[in-house]
From Swiss-Prot:
Its EC number is 2.1.2.9. (6S)-5,6,7,8-tetrahydrofolate binds at residues 110-113. Keywords: Protein biosynthesis, Transferase. GO terms for cellular component: cytosol. This is Methionyl-tRNA formyltransferase. It comes from the Bacteria. Belongs to the Fmt family. Attaches a formyl group to the free amino group of methionyl-tRNA(fMet). The formyl group appears to play a dual role in the initiator identity of N-formylmethionyl-tRNA by promoting its recognition by IF2 and preventing the misappropriation of this tRNA by the elongation apparatus. It catalyses: L-methionyl-tRNA(fMet) + (6R)-10-formyltetrahydrofolate = N-formyl-L-methionyl-tRNA(fMet) + (6S)-5,6,7,8-tetrahydrofolate + H(+). InterPro entries: Fmt (IPR005794), Formyl_trans_C (IPR005793), Formyl_transf_N (IPR002376), Formyl_transf_N_sf (IPR036477), Formyl_transferase-like_C_sf (IPR011034), Met-tRNA-FMT_C (IPR044135), Met-tRNA-FMT_N (IPR041711). It is an enzyme of class 2 (transferase). Transmembrane segments: none annotated. It comes from Mycolicibacterium vanbaalenii (strain DSM 7251 / JCM 13017 / BCRC 16820 / KCTC 9966 / NRRL B-24157 / PYR-1). One of its GO terms (molecular function) is methionyl-tRNA formyltransferase activity.
Amino acid sequence: MRLVFAGTPEPALPSLQRLIDSDRHEVIAVMTRPDAVAGRRGRPSPSPVAQLAAAHGIPVLKPARPNSGEFVAELSALSPDCCAVVAYGALLGDALLAVPAHGWVNLHFSVLPAWRGAAPVQAALAAGDEVTGATTFQIERSLDSGPVYGVVTETIRPTDTAGDLLERLSVSGAGLLEATMDGIEDGTLTAVPQPPEGVSVAPKVTVDDARIRWELPAHVVDRRVRSVTPNPGAWTMIGDQRIKVGPVTVAGDGPKGLEPGEIRVDKKHIHVGTGSDAVLLGTVQPPGKKPMNAADWARGARLDENGWAR
């Protein structure tokens, strides 16, 4: 089939590469978000998807208004059979959805109807799910509610961060997306409506959402920190500094009797109290510095062992 691929960030790259390498499909164009300012230099930079497409000589479309009549006409002129979407980053209107004969097929990183929305991987980790996955489905106007073509599942490991889990899902999901395109082309695949039961939502994670709530039980703090690692990154205030915090370890044999947010420092460890057991900090990142071992930072900062994280 003649395909247009719509995507923007790194997790979309395995899917794009898989379709480029396919001997059954031709990626005739890539649709991605406009160049965004990135890095300290503040210069606009093409998205990862745009860079990969350009490396393969594939035309790159960067509409500022993808639902405008002008862009709908531009896409229609390409006569795509189907459009594949992985983390494009904008909602698509009816006129755009009507362009390809086989519609738009989205790869979503959850087992729908669970975790519809912008942050399904983060939501699954924060909730303590043991299994998640990826789903291909036909895009409709309502968010992530279209009929499903296929699903792959992935076991969530006890130490998974959002980055770890998304990396695995982006690879397994790429195979699912290619298989879905194959099935649509040869007519062997039919989309099945999502069940009305089991719907949950996963809105975009904000910086405020990533602030550690030390009053929560230790196992919940652990999950929530991993769910926002590496982005936007868990954080807390220690003194007057906002400190980013890497994954923590529940310390059942750690200091007892610490209040939520109370810090206990020794030569090799920093423990922080929660609503249950203490947790052991692994890495921290002070403002303007690189991540470092938490105990090393505490020594250099002369952190008061009776300090508080809040």
